[in-house]
């Protein structure tokens, strides 16, 4: 297993082992976030990151991800192959070091990789530690090498198993069911969303996802490939919105040795949608690259608008927010040594990145505005309208602030509050309609459960201007009941959760089409105006039963058609089925037993796996554009629960 060790060559000596991995199995959440669905998918991303690092270094352009029938998963690339030579310090093959030492990998060696997504993660060794079985196969220097592992430990030494013309690495793993006790079943859409994102962020590479599960496995799979990168990404994200200008404004370059890519487009909506990435990592909490983008955008557009004289008649100052209304933008930077901060370590802290992005955006926009004066005028007109709407919205928002319980106003009259004042213990149910609200009030545990009835369908915030949102009585009641305010020391628009009164906010609607629509309206509001509640894990959806199956003295609830059929078969002839179309059809005891009792109920926690994809879906379902919505409904009709 000898390897030539010249500078800039990826070899056994490029691999640096930082620490042991005994810890991983005992404290998996420290390494992958959690051991639920999100943590399970994080395993895949860690392995794919290795292949993406090879692509960033210019050595790989094809990656294949296969969900196997036995719930294992395979990642294959056509890179150089992980080095297999003997590691000087460790005395074993470099492949074994990479696979069994936490933090080991070429990503810590600057001669092998200039930038790396893997730096943020914990490497393929953590995946190995959390897998009941793993196999690594390496195609390198005309030979095939392989090694297998059980729960992070090598079963045998790295062995040569033949000759090959290929290069690359294949890793297959099966998550350990003693650690991932909830599920080891991969979600196709979750993986597809991330792989699509990676294809857009790394134009030119091909990423294929194959699912071999089920009766009709698709061996061809789905191919993600982008020639235009962020330009295509932004068109995909904004496909369901009406464009304000035809062009995507984009740039790709380097400032102070920091590669910067930006794409942006204006639409007719009232929402700001900024997506930022560092070394392919989605930085949900933003950071210096995003603040640099905002500064460059605001200063350049303000300078142009002032010079044009279009702002002369405005009676109030324009703010940075006004320049970003109706803007969808993606900022992607590559940083050699990223420093991550924030609650979830997804906020970039490198100060030098801010000026690099700000300068890049300023130059890009100056050129565009100069060459496209008609589009420039349309953008500035939109900014002026946004400023006027913000001025109106501020007054409405101040009304919301004044009405919050903590600032002297009273709680909404319809709120039936709970006795406890410990937010960690308290939960509030948002219930459609007064009749269902009455049943819920009777059925609840008054010590820790509050009920807020909502009158019919709340406002569709996707189509409404901001001041209309804050003027809406139902929405104002939600703000007041929850005790949240708008504005923190860092951000005047951010949600202030310091005085949040409930740590479980449960949407409880009828199990019919109308109920689903109301749930979606409420979720759209939370996503657009109270996203921090979702990101902090406070939003849940109740799951009331669809059926009650009875025979004689026996009765059982069913939450799906399949469950209903099983119960009918079990009960035999003479069983009767009651279909619950509304919460009001259940009495207080039934509602408590099935939907509100913490010991028996099922709550679905609302999370955001992929912000860009969530944004796209909400725009498509709740926005103005009808054709994409119709196409989605036709494609998904077979999964729908339709009442006729």
Label every PLM stretch briefly.
Residues 388-407, 422-427, 438, 442-444, ...:
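C-terminal interaction appendages of subunits in large macromolecular complexes
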Residues 21, 28-29, 95, 587:
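Conserved activation segment
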Residues 81-86:
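A short glycine-centered beta->alpha linker in the GHKL/HATPase_c
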Residues 87-88, 95:
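Short adenine-binding "F-helix/F-box" segment of the Bergerat
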């Amino acid at each position: 297993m000898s390897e030539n060790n010249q500078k800039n060559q990826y070899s056994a000596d490029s691999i640096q082992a930082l620490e042991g991995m005994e810890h991983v199995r005992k404290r998996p959440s420290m390494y992958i976030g959690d051991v639920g669905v999100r943590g399970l998918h994080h395993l895949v991303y860690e392995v794919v990151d290795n292949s993406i690092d090879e692509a960033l270094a210019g050595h790989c352009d094809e990656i294949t991800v296969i969900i196997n029938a036995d719930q294992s998963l395979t990642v294959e690339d056509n890179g150089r192959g992980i080095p297999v030579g003997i590691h000087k310090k460790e005395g074993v093959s470099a492949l074994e070091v990479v696979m069994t030492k936490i933090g080991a990998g070429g990503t810590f060696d600057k001669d092998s990789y200039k930038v790396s997504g893997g730096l943020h993660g914990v490497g393929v060794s953590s995946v190995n530690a959390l897998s009941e079985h793993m196999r690594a196969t390496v195609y390198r220097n005309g030979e095939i090498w392989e090694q297998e592992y059980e729960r992070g430990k090598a079963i045998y030494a790295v062995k040569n198993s033949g000759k090959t013309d290929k290069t690359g690495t294949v890793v297959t793993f099966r998550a350990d069911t003693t650690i991932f006790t909830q599920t080891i079943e991969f979600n196709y859409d979750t993986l597809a969303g991330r792989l699509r994102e990676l294809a857009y962020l790394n134009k030119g590479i091909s990423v294929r996802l194959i699912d071999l599960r089920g009766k009709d496995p698709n061996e061809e799979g789905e191919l993600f490939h982008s020639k235009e990168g962020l330009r295509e990404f932004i068109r995909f994200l904004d496909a369901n919105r009406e464009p304000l200008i035809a062009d995507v404004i984009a740039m790709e370059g380097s400032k102070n040795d920091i590669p910067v890519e930006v794409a942006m487009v204006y639409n007719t909506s009232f929402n700001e949608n900024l997506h930022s990435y560092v070394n392919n990592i989605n930085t949900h909490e933003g950071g210096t690259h995003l603040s640099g983008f905002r500064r460059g955008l605001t200063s350049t557009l303000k300078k142009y608008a002032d010079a044009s004289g279009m702002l002369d008649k405005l009676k109030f100052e324009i703010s940075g927010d006004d320049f970003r209304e109706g803007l969808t933008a993606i900022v992607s930077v590559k940083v050699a040594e990223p420093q991550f901060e924030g609650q979830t370590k997804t906020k970039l802290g490198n100060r030098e990145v801010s000026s690099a992005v700000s300068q890049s955006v300023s130059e890009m926009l100056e050129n565009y505005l100069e060459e496209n004066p008609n589009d420039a005028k349309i953008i500035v007109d939109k900014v002026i309208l946004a400023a006027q709407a913000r001025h109106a919205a501020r007054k409405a928002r101040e009304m919301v602030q004044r009405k919050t319980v903590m600032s002297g106003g009273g709680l909404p009259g319809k709120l039936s509050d709970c006795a406890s004042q410990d937010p960690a213990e308290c939960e509030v149910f948002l219930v459609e309609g007064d009749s269902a609200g009455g049943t819920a009030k009777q059925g609840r545990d008054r010590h820790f459960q509050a009920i807020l009835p909502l009158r019919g369908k709340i406002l569709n915030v996707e189509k409404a201007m901001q001041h209309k949102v804050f003027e809406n009585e139902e929405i104002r009641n939600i703000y007041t009941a929850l005790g949240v305010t708008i504005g923190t020391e860092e951000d005047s628009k951010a949600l202030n959760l310091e005085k949040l009164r409930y740590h479980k906010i449960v949407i409880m609607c009828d199990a019919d089409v109308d109920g689903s629509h109301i749930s979606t309206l409420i979720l759209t509001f939370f996503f657009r105006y109270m996203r921090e509640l979702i990101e902090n894990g406070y939003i849940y959806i109740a799951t009331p039963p669809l059926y009650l199956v009875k025979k004689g003295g026996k009765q059982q609830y069913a939450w799906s058609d399949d469950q209903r059929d099983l119960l009918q078969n079990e009960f035999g002839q003479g069983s009767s089925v009651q279909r619950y179309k509304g919460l009001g059809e259940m009495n207080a005891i039934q509602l408590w037993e099935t939907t509100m009792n913490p010991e028996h109920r099922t709550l679905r926690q609302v999370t955001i796996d992929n912000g860009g994809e969530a944004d796209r879906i909400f725009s498509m379902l709740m926005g103005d554009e009808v054709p994409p919505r119709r196409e989605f409904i036709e494609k998904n009709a077979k999964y729908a629960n339709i009442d006729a």
